[in-house]
Amino acid sequence: NDIATLALDSSGESLHKRGYRDKTNLAPINEVLAAGLVLLSGWDKRSNFIDPMCGSGTILIEAALIANNIPPGYYREEFGFQRWEKFMPFEEELWNTIFDSSINKITNHNQTIIGGELSPNVAKKAKENCKLAKVEDIVSIRNCDMKDFEVPPGKGVVIINPPYGERMVKDNIDELYKMMGDTFKQKFAGYDCWILSSNMEAFKHVG
């Protein structure tokens, strides 16, 4: 037991925390998971992207970052390695070169990225997060129920992280999933629709 391991923290605050999300609802989705879902969906970055139950807007914001080549660490104030002065002097000039190279790759496409949120307060939080992420001109947030969502013409991808667990009482879950399935069939023809859920019983009601 005479062996010790010494490690240096190169990241600082956890890397999944992008730095843009100030306002959250209950049980918000992890930013890295949200980005992974967008990539897994095969979205082409040009067609419509919709989250009609957007909560605090994380999935929509990550879609906007991916579509416009905005680096995931763009909003972080610093990383742990920037304070390694005694062990390994921080090379600010090299860092600025790397940072500027990433920034120069940012594009400004006109995607249609839209979210819907039933709660006025949560919809407001989503809009505030979009401003913090500087994508408020790309992402549009509507205060509406999913079944009343006005779907833009064309095709695209829908990703939903529906309420679950502490965000919803159990008796309403089956009804919610049935509503999602009905809305997909009635309004989202031509869209690839994804639902993030571990509730296999509830999935039976999607149809």
Language-model features, listed with the residues they occupy:
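Non-catalytic substrate-recognition/targeting regions of SAM-dependent transferases
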Residues: 1-21
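Short, internal active-site loops enriched in acidic
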Residues: 2, 147, 199-202
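Beta-sheet entry/capping signal
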Residues: 3-5, 46-49, 112, 157, ...
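A short, flexible beta-alpha/helix-coil linker loop
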Residues: 13-14, 163-167
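Class I SAM-dependent methyltransferase Rossmann-like catalytic core
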Residues: 19-29
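Conserved S-adenosyl-L-methionine
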Residues: 29-150, 166, 174
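Conserved Class I SAM-dependent methyltransferase catalytic core
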Residues: 110-112, 116-125, 166-207
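A short acidic, Gly/Pro-enriched loop at the edge of an enzyme's catalytic core
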Residues: 147-159
